[in-house]
Amino acid sequence: MLKKPIIIGVTGGSGGGKTSVSRAILNSFPNARIAMIQHDSYYKDQSHISFEERVKTNYDHPLAFDTDFMIQQLKELLAGRPVDIPIYDYKEHTRSNRTFRQEPQDVIIVEGILVLEDERLRELMDIKLFVDTDDDIRIIRRIQRDMVERGRSLESIIEQYTSVVKPMYHQFIEPSKRYADIVIPEGVSNVVAIDLINTKIASILGEL
């Protein structure tokens, strides 16, 4: 195991391909100690309020996340200690009672729409990536994902996108692009960018 694990931040708009890019990196190093942690896992617990109120929460605002807890757990992993990561229930709009045990790794991919927005998170990262995808593609992907995986109606997805997701993208997510070391147009289909990133990671891991 490396003396200091590598932390890679991957961000971009909802439906922009962050997870696909993260998994492409993950799958490129099958023999390495590497894991992905999603900022979504750290949405705040909302079990104390009604379901109707949870639905109204702005999930694209920094205040929706317990980023303090995420930072605390990342520091534990950096120190070589395992953590129990929360598991978020998208259909109930709150944390579940379950957690996932994450052991320390050599490479930790931190993925989420706002992971470059918080300076404290950025300071923990060795490589910062922004996945830059066209707005039309992102909304189509979001509709497909939320209807199939999260059981949501088309009407609710479009309403949330126009009233919350799009404004928050321009207020918080897009401005964080200036902090990225690498901007990846077209996401995982940008093979050249993915190869360059993997080469950098491999050089750090000593696999070249």
UniProtKB/Swiss-Prot annotation:
GO annotation terms (biological process): CTP salvage; UMP salvage
Ligand binding (ATP): G12, G13, S14, G15, G16, G17, K18, T19
Single GO MF annotation: uridine kinase activity
A matching Pfam family: PRK
Pathway in which the depicted protein is active: Pyrimidine metabolism; CTP biosynthesis via salvage pathway; CTP from cytidine: step 1/3; Pyrimidine metabolism; UMP biosynthesis via salvage pathway; UMP from uridine: step 1/1
GO cellular component, one term: cytoplasm
Keywords: ATP-binding, Cytoplasm, Kinase, Nucleotide-binding, Transferase
Enzyme class: transferase
Highest taxon listed in the record's lineage: Bacteria
Localization of this protein: Cytoplasm
Catalyzed reaction equations: uridine + ATP = UMP + ADP + H(+); cytidine + ATP = CMP + ADP + H(+)
CDD domains: UMPK (cd02023)
Gene3D superfamilies assigned: P-loop containing nucleotide triphosphate hydrolases
EC number: 2.7.1.48
InterPro entries: P-loop_NTPase, PRK/URK, Uridine_kinase, Uridine_kinase-like
Principal subcellular localization: cytoplasm
PANTHER family for the chain: URIDINE KINASE
HAMAP family per record: Uridine_kinase (MF_00551)
NCBIfam families: PRK05480.1 (NF004018), udk (TIGR00235)
Record-stated family: Belongs to the uridine kinase family.
The protein's name: Uridine kinase
Protein source organism: Streptococcus equi subsp. zooepidemicus (strain MGCS10565)
GN (gene name): udk
